[in-house]
Amino acid sequence: MFAPGRPLRLVSSRALGLAIPAAALVAGVTIAQLDGGADFLTALAAVATPLLAAGAGWARGWRLPWLPALCVPPLYAVAWLRPEAWSSDLAGVVLIGGACLAITGLVAGVAPRSWLTAGLVLLVVLDVILVWGERQVEPTMNALQAAAPPTIGRPLPELQQVDFGSATMGWLDFAAPALLGLLVQRRFAAGVATGLAAALWGLLLLATSPIAATPPVLVGLVVGRTRRGRLPILSSPLRSRTHEWIHSRRLDAPKPPGS
């Protein structure tokens, strides 16, 4: 969320901006529930995650694009060689987070920001439907949890989902705030708002599990796209007409006697 980004503009497609976030969620859920699909995604994640994380600097347009590539090998070694340690969970979180930064940086290079914003909102809506409506996410998580990564001497790191202690999150739960960071003007305020909203949203786990983890990014989206002194929910043309109406009302207001 707080990571800066100036992604390269590759192409500009409104359809891609609207479709990619939601399509990624649907594809992941569908593949994981196919025969052998969870094993495929697990093997793909074990290999592709470090490669994507290493390219995060280039995908996001950082000043030191090579820095993530230097950090990836030791992180991957920790996740691979110490699978039972808490440091392995932490390394996995960082690697998956870096991969999500890279993916969202690439996605931001192929679609206008406004349509990516609509795509992010659509992703949140679909996430809620699949978690609480269609109940498709829990079987997917269970299938990925049971899948084993390929073995090269010892099993490769399990990077198909984010595991930290007893908490489990999907890739898109990380990708959503990573994409949000590229869509808002006030990134720090959006990050703080998303974090606070996520902490309150997490209280739902006391009543039900699993829960959709992406809705808090909508709070960050509203806060991050709000300019100081501006009406956050109005578009620019509507905001201008609103200000003109207020100004005209002030001019038409009766003046006090003696003024």
What are these language model-derived features?
Residues 1-257:
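A membrane-topology feature that recognizes alpha-helical transmembrane segments
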